[in-house]
Regions:
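Mature extracellular/luminal domains of secreted and GPI-anchored eukaryotic proteins, especially small
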Residues: 1-145
C-alpha cells in the first residue's frame, strides 16, 4: 500500500513525495483496512456511499502524519495534511464541508472517484491514490465561495 500512499500524497499535495516512502513509512495495515472499506463504498456509487468512502480515505489521511514521522516532509505539506486531518475528527464539520463543497461550490469529484476506483481494480495503486488525493483536495482544500 506504499504505492497508494505515495499517490494519495501526490494528489493532495500536488507534487511527488520527495524520497522513498518504503524506507520511512511505518505499518500500513491501517491504511489497507480503510482503503478496502472506501473502495467498497465507492463501488455503490450513491451520495451516502461516496461520503462514507471519503470518510474512510479521511481516516487514512489522519493516519498519514504518524506514519510519516520518520520521513522528511516539508512543513507546508505537513500543514496541508494536518488541516485536512482536523476536519475528519469532527463528524458534523466533515458532513457539512463535504455536502457544501459538493452541492454548493460545485465540486465535481465523481470522475476522480470513478477513475480512482478503476485504477485500483487494475492494480495501479499509485494512480488510484493520486485520484483519491485530488478528490480530497478538491473537497477539503478548495477555497469556499
Amino acid at each position: 500500500m506504499i504505492s497508494f500512499a505515495e499517490g494519495l500524497l501526490y494528489g493532495i499535495l500536488e507534487e511527488a513525495f520527495p524520497g522513498d516512502l518504503a524506507h520511512c513509512i511505518g505499518d500500513t495495515s491501517e491504511i489497507e483496512v480503510h482503503l478496502e472499506k472506501a473502495i467498497n463504498d465507492f463501488k455503490i456509487e450513491t451520495f451516502d456511499s461516496i461520503k462514507s468512502g471519503i470518510k474512510e480515505i479521511g481516516i487514512i489521511v489522519q493516519a498519514i502524519p504518524s506514519l510519516l514521522k520518520d520521513c522528511k516532509i516539508e512543513e507546508n505539506d505537513l500543514k496541508k495534511l494536518a488541516e485536512m486531518a482536523v476536519i475528519f475528527t469532527h463528524p458534523l464539520t466533515l458532513a457539512l464541508r463535504v455536502g457544501k463543497n459538493i452541492l454548493v461550490n460545485g465540486v465535481d469529484i465523481y470522475d476522480k472517484i470513478s477513475k480512482g476506483l478503476t485504477l485500483y481494480q487494475s492494480a495501479d495503486y499509485n494512480g488510484s491514490g493520486r485520484q483519491f488525493g485530488m478528490a480530497l483536495a478538491e473537497v477539503f482544500l478548495k477555497t469556499s465561495s
